[in-house]
């Protein structure tokens, strides 16, 4: 709201923007509930869920990697969300489950605080997004774009 007030609501009315979003599901619900209980606050702040996922993806990739060199961790990141892998979510119990699967040599499919995420061949991540707009001086969510729709949009842009 500092931006809207600083610029003046009359100048930004009906402006649109995009941000990362959370796609509804069990891992998102578990993260939001745990965050609320721990901090007595809503987890919908800028970067809260994406930063959590970044740390989790890195920690899981470090455990998947054959060694802790940059190239090995980089290559392991793609295997954090393996199609057909055993689903793992957020929180300590799910992290422990993921580590047990990794140690057993089984693939995992992480769905985090953001929801499902995927890495392409270049290591770029795709995930859900939201479109926000300024309406009567307030920032409101216009719509959420799920992972599948974001991937289709990315393919259209790339082609």
Cite the ranges covered by each PLM segment:
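Extracytosolic ligand-binding ectodomains
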Residues: 1-159
């Amino acid at each position: 709201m500092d931006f809207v007030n600083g610029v003046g609501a009359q100048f930004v009315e009906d402006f649109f923007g995009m941000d990362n979003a959370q796609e509804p599901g069990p891992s998102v619900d578990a993260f939001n509930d745990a965050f609320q209980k721990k901090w007595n606050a809503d987890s919908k702040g800028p970067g809260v869920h994406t930063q959590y996922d970044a740390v989790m993806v890195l920690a899981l990739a470090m455990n998947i990697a054959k060694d802790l060199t940059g190239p090995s961790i980089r290559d392991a990141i793609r295997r954090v969300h393996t199609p057909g892998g055993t689903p793992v979510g957020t929180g300590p119990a799910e992290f422990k489950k993921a580590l047990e699967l990794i140690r057993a040599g089984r693939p995992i499919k992480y769905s985090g605080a953001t929801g499902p995420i995927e890495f392409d061949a270049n290591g770029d991540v795709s995930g859900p997004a939201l479109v926000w707009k300024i309406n009567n001086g307030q920032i409101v969510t216009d719509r959420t774009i799920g992972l599948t729709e974001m991937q289709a949009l990315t393919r259209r842009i790339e082609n």
